[in-house]
């Protein structure tokens, strides 16, 4: 199925279901928080927040989206793309979870000849937010999805937000099983290469506040009304329906690759991975560049313009590395137009401008390449004249920084000149540049608008950290900031709770948040004439790795820049933090003992009494592995290992076997933390206990997935661990008392009760269905005549599900013969729900009756809604009081037909 057909079917499906088709917004919106539109719902945010009244209750669109954080990964893997199309359906206070699930399931599983995509229902899985029992029930009832193909996942996976303040809520994702040739079974939780996500249903019900990451943010409260936002990836669906492994093989990007291959001396897919990467970069970036130019972006040196410039220059550079020396961008824009024009007519109508801008950038960059090449030749000649065989890192950096030369291009040109490149020196200079940029970014994060004054503090007055040796330090105030502005004085009388107040000190015992360890808490108090001044420290951040910024609340007196103060860490807080950090090292060591050296750290968080450790690992841990990890850790606690730290050279630390976080940049001199000699040895700048016994018991709470190939272990330490165990013990004692068995027999007793309950429920269902079928026989005999139609419209016994009703409707319809007939059954369900099913046989359809139309009349009387096909439709409502009215409304509707 071609991509344009996939798009058409999506829009047609939802337009038929009462949605208004809304054109894609530009990828550029007037939003300071958003560089590019990166989700289908962005243009509807004011509606979701209740800031504007939508002109429709249901909408559908296919949105152009751009994401560039992983631009360097494009081409290297086949999963990353800078441009993608997000098909979505949206409800603004209209339908909610049930409707979203039903619409998605119908489109995915309906046969191709009925307007669907024809996915095999047996190949579909769903994930839901771990607390969303309602979604699990709906997947079973609406889609018939068995419980074994529904998986619960945590906030990082199934609680959606845009990553910035705005709407948020639990989500449910639909996955397609590609089969055993793509990996192990077990659903998305086990293998996201085999199980591919194609659709995300977001049940938008809250607004999120400030925060970082996928789960570290505040949920502010409910939205004015519940909304639905879904997103189906057009490219991923195209891959599956076209039977290819990745988007580069679809009708969207393969034409671009073929156009390049027709001009390059080396073809695509001929065994050279580096060449294939270049082909994919050209295909992806050409498409994104065309979309950006079409939406009004021009190449520039900052913001969106810089992204476009970088994309085009990567295209040009990749083409040259493939051996294409002449101009190529103009032809690539034409190929993109031909492939994407049917979906985005602006690429056709505005093609001349798009091509002109792209070609102008190519011409300019070719001049840059020419100038840079001359600089390279001069540097190469100077290097050889000096008797060296390696181009300096400074020369490579200048080529990169001044002329935009990627290091890969410099490396290739150097190899052609029989020279190596000082990559380490280049990376060091790049790191310095990034550090300067990070200092600015960190300053902005701290809301410092006076960046010049802030840089002065960074350069002239680095903070001396004293917290390894003492918890109380005499210090001088270097700077005071209120809401990001530097001020000379701040006092209790002038600073309210709404103000963000920060003190910068020349010396500090407070640990600043880093390395997974959260910041210390404590107090800063005045001395001498300012002895009445007191502030509570709630957070400490490090700027440019040299300056400690203390977030405070002024409780009394006033602080003046230059004053001498006493900075004191809360000893209980520090002790808890050291327990968590040392516990993290020990859990890491235990993981590697049990799982082997491939269990490498991917991240961590430790705070008083708690630790969280992420590590690279494929698949969930077994119960035995979790038990072993916990046992090894606690054996090390009991061994009372000595914990000590020392400073040494980086290379020496590595030769000793010290563990380092992959991808982290370390200085030449590093701090090493050793626990029990060979048990644990890691590079670390955090605070730790003096002996392993001070950690106290370590209790592993659980293990989960936080992404493809990354697992997470969470644990309590110290008193928090004891309290958790005491709570578990009390819970077990209560269960044992209720079940009247010893504690060790509780699991077996509970398992037995569960089996008995399942058997009883199964027997109850069988009896209820048998009674209902007996009633159905009587219903056939008592069918009433309404006009030309035989009608069976009955209120069934309570407790029947929609599935039970469908079974009975089928039985009754089969017994009514070939005369025009309509069957409508309604029952009182759980929690005052009212499920109903309507069936219309072919003869009645010939009279103009449609089940999906009748079910609307039926549902209106019970405050519900439904949908389906002409022969069979179903729905549900609220309130059994309306059942008789629903049956009467149905009779009246049939009588009118």
UniProtKB/Swiss-Prot annotation:
GO cellular component: cytosol
UniProt record, GO biological process: alanyl-tRNA aminoacylation
InterPro entries the record matches: aa-tRNA-synth_II/BPL/LPL, Ala-tRNA-lgiase_IIc, Ala-tRNA-ligase_IIc_anticod-bd, Ala-tRNA-synth_IIc_core, Ala-tRNA-synth_IIc_N, Ala-tRNA_ligase, Ala_tRNA_ligase_euk/bac, DHHA1_dom
Main location: cytoplasm
A Pfam family matched in the record: tRNA-synt_2c
Compartmental location: Cytoplasm
Recorded superkingdom: Bacteria
Keyword Zinc: yes
EC numbers for this chain: 6.1.1.7
Sequence positions that bind Zn(2+): 581, 585, 684, 688
Catalytic activity: tRNA(Ala) + L-alanine + ATP = L-alanyl-tRNA(Ala) + AMP + diphosphate
Cofactor stoichiometry and binding remark: Binds 1 zinc ion per subunit.
Keywords: Aminoacyl-tRNA synthetase, ATP-binding, Cytoplasm, Ligase, Metal-binding, Nucleotide-binding, Protein biosynthesis, RNA-binding, tRNA-binding, Zinc
Cofactor: Zn(2+)
GO molecular function: alanine-tRNA ligase activity; aminoacyl-tRNA deacylase activity; ATP binding; tRNA binding; zinc ion binding
Family per similarity comment: Belongs to the class-II aminoacyl-tRNA synthetase family.
HAMAP family with a match to the protein in the record: Ala_tRNA_synth_B
Role summary: Catalyzes the attachment of alanine to tRNA(Ala) in a two-step reaction: alanine is first activated by ATP to form Ala-AMP and then transferred to the acceptor end of tRNA(Ala). Also edits incorrectly charged Ser-tRNA(Ala) and Gly-tRNA(Ala) via its editing domain.
Note on domains (UniProt): Consists of three domains; the N-terminal catalytic domain, the editing domain and the C-terminal C-Ala domain. The editing domain removes incorrectly charged amino acids, while the C-Ala domain, along with tRNA(Ala), serves as a bridge to cooperatively bring together the editing and aminoacylation centers thus stimulating deacylation of misacylated tRNAs.
Record's protein name: Alanine--tRNA ligase
Gene: alaS
